Amino acid sequence: MITKNNVRAANKNEKTIETTKLSKKSDWKLLLVNYQNKINSDAKIDVVQLKNGQAIDKRCYEELQQMMDDCRDEGLDPIICSSYRSYRKQKILYEQKIYDLLNEGYSQTKAKNEAATVVAIPGTSEHEIGLAVDIVDDNYQMLENEQENTPVQKWLMKNCWKYGFILRYPENKKKITGVIYEP
């Protein structure tokens, strides 16, 4: 956070820069979880169960439900295929991906590095805080780049912001996010 500071400009004129804090550090909507901002393995998340057995942080349930309803009102069939998962579940997924890559001939180091671009290291996934949902088209339920061409994904990419959601891992941003594109 920047507070009032006197800054000398190149022309030696004094200028005052004043900024305000954008949010409280505890603002759950702005919680960033990634490789630099890990969560504890024992984090307590208050989730609500969805009809299909998935779960999300209860604080974003209404917005998610409204987004899904509005998408369906357009004649589309969105499906939540992945949402909240515990640290333990994340660890299992990550270790399974490493195992799969080792069986493909990757070295231990390369397998771990490659796995981390596809499956988040435990403690670094927004799924572990219940704020991430993977939504697919009922007619194409694969979590692949081709998902971006489905009517559901096109609608979501155009409208998700209206409900407080974003495309978390955009195309061509792997160097910034550390994660491959996930439409």
Would you name each region that the model predicts?
Residues 1-183:
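Extracytoplasmic cell-surface/polysaccharide-interacting catalytic and binding patches
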